[in-house]
Amino acid sequence: MKLAKQVPLYYYLILLASTAIVIGIQWDISWHSTIGRDKLLSPPHLVVYIGGIICGLICTFIVFKETFFNKISEGVAFWGFKAPLACWICIWGMIAMLTSAPFDDWWHNAYGLDVQIISPPHIVLAMGIFSVILGSCILILTRKNLNPSNFIYDILYIYASSLILVQFSIILTEYSFANKQHSYEFYKVSSILYPFVLIAFKIPSKYKYAATYITSLYMIHRMLIVWILPLFPAEPLLGPIYREVTSYIAPYFPVLLIIPAIFIDIIYP
């Protein structure tokens, strides 16, 4: 408990906001699948954008603190301000996320409904989200290296890494449908991206089974979404309606990454 109190509050807040972003994205996909076209400020969009704004504001606070109150700051200088590189990554991510909002609204008005997750506005949004979560992860990792005796930072780092893995799995949704899992495309994409992410985020951790812990949190997160979303009522509002539904459509069961993660932990020193 004492070690937990030594961690500044904004580290917990930035992870909470990052979690809200990832949950909001999955809610938004379910919203599109269930209800149909949504407005710019629909509830899932608000959750995503507010999460990004909170992360950006926290990093802006760190920028001002390091610039004006830390005279020996060795952070990255930009326009006269100084802060850790992770903060600049987060702030850039927030700007990209907010830029994607009017871009996505214009895209829908110009070209109609999305037929797939990966579209130009969504790529901008995904880059912004990835930058925000990656910046949060690097920020925690930096603090972890400066405080190696405080294992709380290790736990926070593992959790932040799991959010990045969830984000990658969302991007690969259209390659991971049940019928696609018998195709060459699924194995090609999964075999390249997932091991890269797992090994990249396992290396900085001091835990032997870091990849297993990361994928365990990823599985828990994805399964909770699968179980919780259908508990809330929703119905299609965009015709033509070919299938009546009365609750949110849940995503497919997640890819079992925990199994290869165990082998990675055993093989990788």
Label each residue range with its predicted role:
Residues 13-23, 87-104, 127-134, 154-175, ...:
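Alpha-helical transmembrane segments of multi-pass integral membrane proteins
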Residues 46-64, 123-140, 188-206, 252-267:
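Hydrophobic cores of alpha-helical transmembrane segments in multi-pass inner/ER membrane proteins
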Residues 6-15, 36-57, 81-89, 115-128, ...:
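Membrane-entry segments of alpha-helical transmembrane domains in multi-pass membrane proteins
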Residues 76-89, 102-160, 173-183:
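Membrane-interface helix-loop-helix junctions at boundaries between adjacent transmembrane segments
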Residues 225-269:
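Anaerobic metallocofactor- and corrinoid-dependent redox/one-carbon enzyme cores
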Residues 26-46, 103-123, 170-190, 228-246:
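Membrane-interface interhelical loops and short amphipathic "cap" helices
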Residues 1-12, 27-38, 57-85, 110, ...:
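Juxtamembrane membrane-water interface segments of multi-pass membrane proteins
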